[in-house]
């Protein structure tokens, strides 16, 4: 008895593989979430002068290093996709593990940064700025964690030569996570 193809390998009515279409729908919903947070942040920042003072206490060094880490991890996601396109599952897995390593480094730096800020009294309840800061950065960090978990399972399958099409989908998600950080970094760390 032949089993039907898994749905993620089939094509939708648009001709786009259903797995890729699902990722694009997920990213569209994430844009709504992050877009709302960012627009709310901008509106509050423009109408509250004390936000500039509060933002002076964020660590531009930590944010800058994390930006470099995420951009580098995005490069390794691209290299993973190239390996998957060539049918090299082990190579794709290797680069996905590098990407996961970047996620872990990002989270370690973010944890250190938050520890320093909290120990200096800059908690989520200290001011509206710090509430937005922790919510925006926390939502982003949760997406970094989620992306790393997904990439781990995709890398495991890729190492065995299975479901190499998922490498691209994981990469699309990871690039979105990086893109969100590209918006958060200047708003939270540079615009002081």
What are these regions (language model features)?
Residues 1-192:
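...captures the hydrophobic TM-helix bundle architecture rather than a specific catalytic motif
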């Amino acid at each position: 008895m032949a089993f039907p193809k898994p749905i993620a390998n089939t094509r939708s009515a648009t001709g786009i593989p259903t797995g890729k279409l699902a990722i694009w729908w997920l990213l569209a919903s994430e844009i709504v979430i992050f877009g709302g947070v960012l627009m709310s942040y901008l509106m509050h920042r423009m109408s509250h002068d004390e936000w500039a003072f509060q933002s002076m206490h964020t660590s531009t060094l930590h944010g800058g290093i994390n930006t470099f880490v995420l951009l580098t991890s995005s490069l390794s996601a691209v290299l993973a996709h190239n390996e998957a396109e060539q049918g090299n599952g082990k190579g794709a897995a290797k680069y996905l593990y590098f990407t996961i390593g970047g996620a872990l480094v990002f989270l370690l730096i973010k944890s250190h940064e938050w520890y320093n800020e909290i120990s200096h009294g800059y908690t989520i309840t200290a001011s509206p700025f710090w509430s937005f800061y922790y919510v925006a950065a926390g939502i982003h960090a949760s997406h970094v964690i989620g992306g790393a978990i997904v990439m781990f399972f995709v890398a495991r399958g890729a190492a065995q030569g299975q479901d190499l099409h998922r490498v691209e989908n994981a990469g699309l998600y990871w690039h979105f996570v990086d893109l969100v950080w590209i918006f958060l970094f200047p708003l939270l760390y540079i615009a002081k």
